[in-house]
């Protein structure tokens, strides 16, 4: 398997761990007693805005754009197009959730219960998006793209590292500790 595909799958595994931990925390009846959940959610959304939305999804877009020229069936073409447009929708959803988190932290009228429901919907979108890529799009790419395509994608793989799991940016220390717990 190519470095490019390995990287995409590794990114999914890492984000999946973060999403799973956050979902469990939000759904816990102890959420508000433990405190700090809003700060953790803010850190997670900030991370998604910084890395998956800005680095990971454009990498996937390059992969999927190569697929378009591979004689796809109409259903496969529709799946690729849907996924490409979904990346933009996920970025918008990230921005909306961050605005809601910021508003609650600033004392706005949005309740923590409503924010928790919004966050769970957002996390579900992320999970479903990654599931579709892992089960449908990545196998399609591996079946249709040539070794030369993957070599070209490997060369395009930029050096930008994951700020949460690789760079260990200090602003994400609490989030990383939370995920590891």
Model segments located where?
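Small-residue-biased structural context
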Residues: 1-181
């Amino acid at each position: 398997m190519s470095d490019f595909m390995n990287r995409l799958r590794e990114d999914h595994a890492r984000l999946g761990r973060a999403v799973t931990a956050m979902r469990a925390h939000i759904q816990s009846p102890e959420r508000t007693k433990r405190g700090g959940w809003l700060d953790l959610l803010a850190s997670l959304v900030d991370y998604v805005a910084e890395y998956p939305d800005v680095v990971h999804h454009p990498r996937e877009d390059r992969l999927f754009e190569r697929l378009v020229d591979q004689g796809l069936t109409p259903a496969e073409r529709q799946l690729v197009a849907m996924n490409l447009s979904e990346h933009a929708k996920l970025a918008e959803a990230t921005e909306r959730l961050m605005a809601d988190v910021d508003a609650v932290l600033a004392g706005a009228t949005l309740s923590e219960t409503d924010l928790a429901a919004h966050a769970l919907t957002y996390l579900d979108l992320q999970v479903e998006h990654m599931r579709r890529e892992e089960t449908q799009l990545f196998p399609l790419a591996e079946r249709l793209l040539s070794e030369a395509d993957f070599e070209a994608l490997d060369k395009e793989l930029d050096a930008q590292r994951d700020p949460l799991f690789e760079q260990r940016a200090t602003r994400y220390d609490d989030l990383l500790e939370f995920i590891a717990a």
